[in-house]
Amino acid sequence: MPLASRLFLRHARALALAVLAACVWASWGGSRLEVDDQPTSIIRSDDAAFAQMEEVFEQFGSDDGTCLLLLEGSDPFTPAGAAGLRRVTDALTGLEGLVAGVTSLLDLRDPLGRPLVPEPEAGPERFAAARERARLHPLAADKLLGSDGTTNLVLAQLADETLPVAELRTRVRAIEAALEEPSSTQPWTVSLTGVPPLRVQIFDAIRREQVVLSLLAGLVGAAISFAVFRRLAPVLITSAASLVSAWWALGVMGAAGETINLLNAALPVLVLVIALTDGMHLMIAILRRREEGADPHRAGAHAIRSLGRACMLTSLTTAIGFASLAVSDIEVIRRFGLVFAGAVGLTFLAVVTVVPLLGSAFLKRAPSGSPALHGAGLARPFELLARAVVVRSRMVTAVGTLLTLGMAALSLQMVPDNRLTEAVPHDHGAARSLERMEAVFGGSVETSILVEYEDEQRGLDAMVAVHEALEREPFASGALSIVDVLRSLPGQGTPQAAALGLLPEALTRSLVRRDLRRALVRFRVPDEGAAVAEPGYARIQEALEGVEGEHPGVALHLTGTGFVARRNVNLIIEDFALGLWVAALTIVLVLAVAFRSLRLGLLSVVPNAFPLAVAGSVLTALDLELQVSSVLAFTVCLGIAVDDTIHLVSRYREERDRGRAPEEAAVRAVTAVGRALVITTLVLVGGWAMLLLSEVPTTQLFGLIGLVGLT
């Protein structure tokens, strides 16, 4: 890039002022950034299922705003158990403005209209009779009372169901504080679980670790860089360029009105990795030129002239490749692709300006030379390796291609998977409580069946059939609908539509909307992976189709957060994984055009695809799920592979333009670029390894795949 090099030589001060102005502007943009921690933002789509779920929430209320209190070792049908249950519910109802409603066994009535749970002063016979009635009560068994008889649930519905995590945290903490007194005075345990506390624990764990792990990764990477460069200035300069890249990217996101969500929150890490790679190449070129006697300013200009084109191609091809994600049907992926493409372009500008500018200011002392970096100690092994490969080029190409194809085929066996607790540390209270709840109640993830009917009685008859189908299905448990409410009334056998008029609308609004001729059948499913969940939902869907056929005028639809979120997150993973392969192929085409050689473009397929194939095959071999964190790690692998490939091919073309034979050009390219590749890889691997120390399973998976792809 001769023009950019001359611009740097003649107008370095103006360039520095422009960089400072861009940083100020990025600070303004970054100050406008907001975090979108709404649970439905990442699963939002334009399809009918999501629109139907939102409509159901508007009509019946959300299904993910309920805290579940698991009371274990407490028989509510004893004087002590009944008194303890009442203390728990009283503590929750006292949280006015935070908790909208509390549901427990205390709200149920027996056929005579008496409380199902007697007062603590009642005699043993009364409690024994109540225990037997509860076992058969349609609103108690497997819904509020566990199969063991000593575990029961209390449901605390939060006021204002759709809340950001900050507000959720306040309410969860208030519930925990309110439960301290009734929990401490009882021999049984009270634990809090459900979607709100799980969400709070996930965000808190990730936020806490972001600071600690980022600091550790930075320190390890800096230590490795210092060991290689043997000087502090090159380490600080390359680190500063990477940080400025992330800074600018966040600034543009804020200025454009983009919000931080669970997907694009990883963008700063991806930008840092790409910036560090290019920054290392530039720094090594500058130091090498300084050892040859050039002053810092001219050394920086030479680095821009010799490597600027390769850095630009790296950014251009990566940006075009990820911009191809804009064709996705899922909004969050479309936006991620466009934002990432823009961020990569800014990364190029930051690296090719910040590294030379800081080098001019802080590399004035003549380098003493690092044998590991500049001498023959590291160059000789690369030369020997390159010559060995060149001699056996056909065999190496064939073996590499076959390995890539084989591992890619193995990677295709991966299936997308997601669970409610996949990002929750296994030893955290809410996750452990959820596991115990599933063992006793059969499930924890709420799903719903929307029942649309023309005639009320036909609708009730269809709901009875749905209940019978769910009772036969091992994947479902705890089905609840207006049918159960009607069955709990005195003298009710087969639910009759006429009895609906006896029920207060305020108590049944979450189950039936007579004005809309709609009702819900709510049930729970276990928080299992795709191997269990997908067949389970398929069997339920098949059963619903059978019920529809037997009840004309009735339509049944699976809905709810548990069902729609699983499906849409899986679609995100599938679309993202496919988009990465499309991006890889797009990058190949761009390279072919940039180097004016279809052959070089095709030759870059294997080195670009190899890290993805290796990481995918390792994931398959370890029987690990393909999650959102997995595809983000694949993004890192692709970005690094493209960067390394372009720098190597660019140097090869440069050697060929000097008249060297293909074999000699390849050897010299590997010898010259290989050192930078090794140094960059060592720094990234050292920092990335710190992610394995995380207590968050998805972060550990992200770190594992990144390490495999980088090495």
Model-derived regions: residue spans:
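Feature of extramembrane
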Residues: 1-228, 232-233, 374-577, 581
